[in-house]
Amino acid sequence: AKCDEGAEKTVVIYWMYDTMPVTQPDVWIAPPFEGRLVEMAPFKKVLVGRGATNSKGPQMAQWNALMSIRAAVGKLPVNLIFVAEGDEERMSIGYRQFVRQHPDLFKGATAMYRFGSQGFSGGGELSGASEGCVYVEITTSGTKWGRGPTVSDIHGGNKRSVDSPAWRHIKMLQTLVSDDGNKILIDGFYDNIEPLSKDEQSKLEAAAKGVDMDIAAKNLGVARFISDDPLTYLKMARYGTSMNLDGIWGGNMYAGGAGAILPNKITSKHNFRYLPKQDGMDITRKLRAHLDKHGYQDVEM
């Protein structure tokens, strides 16, 4: 959608309306797909629903603000192009095609993505950083390894005499990151990362002065951050990289009770966050090379 105000400058506003599936509906205080106003301290009434914060709520607030300015002033100081996609959670495949097919639409334009960043204090935050994301599933199986259970899970008592793909998977994961999980040990991962410009550094330092670490932790629901220094925290949050362990599954997945299983295979899911000069496919190639180098040629990606 376009909003042509006859201005010299044009801003492309990116929106996304898809969400991830609801995996824990029992922890929601209201039906996730209903959209319900509920009382929640310290905000009084809040809207609870899937995508309320990421990102349909902030997008609607942005739209209301822009239309209010337009109604009060007569027109906006810039032209607007709204580009909304429902494919973000699948790596924006359709969006990439759209950009390639309509290069003139984006020529000379500034892009902006408005995320919900209001915290307990009521203040907002303007972020000038960007990131890429790659999801990877890694599987270790006795079938590919040629050791341990090669057809299906077997009784856990057999571990006394049979190798375990599960333990092999855990040992493999230990080669990928430092002991605290905060440094990626894949050769070449940090290649092509450019240092911050003077302008970026000065803006970061200015923003750090307004960061209350206690409020930031409360907003996110964590006890503390990797660093207690506001500037370091902000630099990590905006310009950092990571390899996260999203989840791991295989074998006996039921909590409590008895049940001895020696799994045939274990799978873990990960997401890499990387910076503009890095490349997602290059990162996956380097991950494959790392696994091969450390003797895990049988591990599948």
Name each model-derived stretch.
Residues 27, 74, 127-133, 237, ...:
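Short glycine/proline-enriched loop/turn "hinge" motifs that connect secondary-structure elements
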Residues 162, 255-264:
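Short, solvent-exposed beta-strand/turn "edge" segments of beta-rich domains on protein surfaces
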Residues 18, 87, 118-120, 143-145, ...:
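Short, glycine-/Ser/Thr-/acidic-enriched flexible segments
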Residues 43-131:
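Acidic/histidine-rich catalytic neighborhood of metal-dependent amide-processing enzymes
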Residues 1-2, 157-160, 267-275:
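Short, well-ordered beta-strand elements within core beta-sheets of diverse protein domains
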Residues 105, 128-135, 145-253, 277-298:
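Acidic-enriched catalytic cores of C-N bond-cleaving enzymes acting on peptides and small amides
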Residues 1-52, 69-78, 270:
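Acidic/His- and Gly-rich active-site-bordering loop/insert found
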Residues 136-141, 264-272:
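Oligomerization/assembly interface segments of phage tail-like spikes and tubes
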